[in-house]
């Protein structure tokens, strides 16, 4: 389907006169080219026409955003009036709340439509400029990028609107009685299960996702008495590692006890409260859960603490004096601080990677049953080296001024997607809420089990120093957008086609080639970021690595397992078609030409020279039980053969009888030593997730042969005697 036709079918009817006149611009290029080539005057006229279209789109988007803010302010006034009437003689009735809810729902739809409006016009400008540069021979792309940056309708941030709408909608939905959190919700410590999964969200779907979630969960605001500002959502972490990248490898390979140490702060750089955190990975077979622990530390003491000059006793002296925490809690924090300090000093840890993102958290205050966080504008920055941090624990030449344009390309990776994390706490056998099911099974998200910002940062920023890459590494060059599976927000689209379902086609050219841009060009910024994040100039890999089915350590939903990882399987294996008994579904976007999908998935990936893709393998606890059962079966056989040998030896009166008894005893000893060696070898390889053969091709046959030999020898010796 041509983009012009697609634009007509997916635009909002109410906004149709404010869209880019794509057909007019396209015809203008064709008409002037047909008249004898493209002259300087033609270029000037076309740029002027393009400027008018940009002014039209930018003015409409700006005015519409102001209108939305005004409508929200009006709803806030109406809500304040309802609050005042709650305890009066004339309390609000159901109709008052229904009117407010209808208005808020309409505002949400408007915000959603505005986001889609910006997305579609952004794509239209890209398409027409690409067509211009291709057919005229004049390069307009870099020049017009500056004009777009001056009128950035496509960079509108809706976070403030989402927070305001969340607060209002939560009040109206609960009819003036906001639900208070229950810290014990979900069961006691003995009968509930925690489940966590991570997803990628394409930027085009972020606004729709936020609006859908806030209809069920309010945005968690830690300081409701303060007006929300963008810096309130900023979270910055400094990850530490040593020169051998041991902590990176440990976290990537999911080694038992693997640690990650980071220093984190919230908001601006002038925040004096730093949190030192340690994440420890635990394997399922240990019966323990992975844990994250942290303790606070003032910024002025961080350098001294990391050098060992500032002792743990000094760090917690004030906390002991204040008495706000129990002695047991303080001792636990001190023990953690000592362990972290010892690890940093003994293993030569230094700052390596900084992660920055803006987090929107959705949760009922104090209620841990459903917790959702969405991290946007994720940036991973090099923190190592004297030219950056020197002797300081963090570099000071940057703050939270995303997108950090002052940094060179080799120092930063701007992650192309938002990160959605869903945490559930439910009783055993209890299903998650239906709306959560709909969310994680929808086209808005792409499941990425065990995704790690630290691992991705090291693997991209230090690409030349690592040999193992995370399993999602090849996925970075594949468009994760999928056809719409649910209509979460009822917008004003003229047709029933959901704009996010066409995005994968819109942003892919007719030759099925992904869009990439260079330099400061505005065009398809997320594709530029994604492609540059690999730190590899060769788009074609050379050394083949086979990929097995991906699995995640903690499964959120059975259905999510089938649908959520669809494009991973399509990318890592062959394109799946007409599979009925598989866990995955095909999600190649198709419109009028189903035989020619506009998103192409590679049938096979090969890793770069000298690199290997590490695919996580889940080891079920029953694997160890099966290993133990096999070992016990061998021991049972050994006991039987040993008992026979000892019995024969007890009644042996002749030399042949003693030799016969000895043959059974030797068989028993051989079985004990062999089975013990095999058990230990298998246990070590399973714990290390080594890709070796675990079947015993020779052991059972050898046992049968020597058993037959022992019996035969005993018969022959007794017959001769």
Curated annotation (Swiss-Prot):
The chain crosses the membrane at residues 632-652, 658-678, 698-718. Residues 1-146 form the SPX domain. One of its GO terms (biological process) is vacuolar transport. It is an enzyme of class 2 (transferase). Mn(2+) binds at residue 421. Its cofactor is Mn(2+). ATP binds at residues 198, 262, 264, 279, 292, 357, 359. The active site is at 453. Its EC number is 2.7.4.1. GO terms for cellular component: endoplasmic reticulum; fungal-type vacuole membrane; vacuolar transporter chaperone complex. Its main location: membrane. The VTC core complex is an integral membrane heterooligomer composed of at least the catalytic subunit vtc4 and the accessory subunits vtc1 and vtc2. vtc1 is a small membrane protein without hydrophilic domain. Vtc2 and vtc4 are related and have 2 hydrophilic domains that face the cytosol, an N-terminal SPX domain and the central core domain. The central core in vtc4 is the catalytic domain. This is Vacuolar transporter chaperone complex subunit 4. It comes from Schizosaccharomyces pombe (strain 972 / ATCC 24843). The gene is vtc4.
